[in-house]
Regions:
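Ligand-binding pockets and gating/stacking loops
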Residues: 1-188
Length: 188
């Protein structure tokens, strides 16, 4: 009966307000339902021997942990930095210096070859992670890969010159068109 006293604009404003409140209540209810939903189980057994693993095995171990965290919805955002994964020289066969030192290669072929060993291992580790995501089916029928965006990159395209121009990155997963290589002009 009080609505008769309001102008049309006031009625629309009130309707908008009450609709917003109802939508917020619905979202809160959905959140409550999510809280009681049991997390998926997994049969993966984590190694007790992490410290004794070589760098390639340690990368796989951390990628396995990341997959499990995403699979069980324990988190939705993960960041992994390789600098903390190995000893000073990276733990790679054929590598005699740490990554940072090698990145300032001075165009010396031997140094660049060592850097390539590390970067190849990093890319193989990322491919391993993506393959694991593709193997896990979700209740929706999609794979975990389809429901995840994974970004792989570095802060510099050339540590030799401290340049971040033409910075190569890989973005993989769901939610966008695949199979493209983008090359942008330097002015961008």
């Amino acid at each position: 009966k009080h609505q008769d006293k309001f102008s049309k604009a006031d009625k629309e404003k009130l309707d908008q307000y009450f609709t917003s409140i109802r939508e917020l209540e619905k979202r809160a209810e959905q959140s409550r339902n999510w809280l009681d939903k049991p997390k998926p189980s997994t049969d993966y057994v984590l190694s007790d021997e992490v410290d004794s693993l070589d760098i390639a095995q340690r990368m796989k171990y951390y990628y396995d942990l990341m997959v499990l965290a995403l699979q069980t919805d324990s988190t939705r955002v993960i960041s992994l930095s390789f600098s903390a994964l190995g000893p000073n020289y990276g733990g790679f066969t054929g590598v005699s210096h740490d990554y940072h030192t090698l990145s300032h290669h001075g165009n010396v072929p031997e140094t660049m070859e060592e850097l390539l060993i590390i970067e190849k291992a990093y890319m193989e580790g990322f491919a391993y992670f993506l393959d694991k995501l593709k193997q896990i089916k979700e209740p929706s029928g999609k794979t975990l890969f389809d429901s995840t965006m994974s970004l792989f990159g570095c802060g510099m395209s050339s540590g030799n010159s401290h340049s971040n121009r033409n910075l190569p990155v890989v973005l993989a997963g769901g939610g966008f068109k695949h199979g493209e290589h983008k090359k942008y002009e330097r002015s961008n």
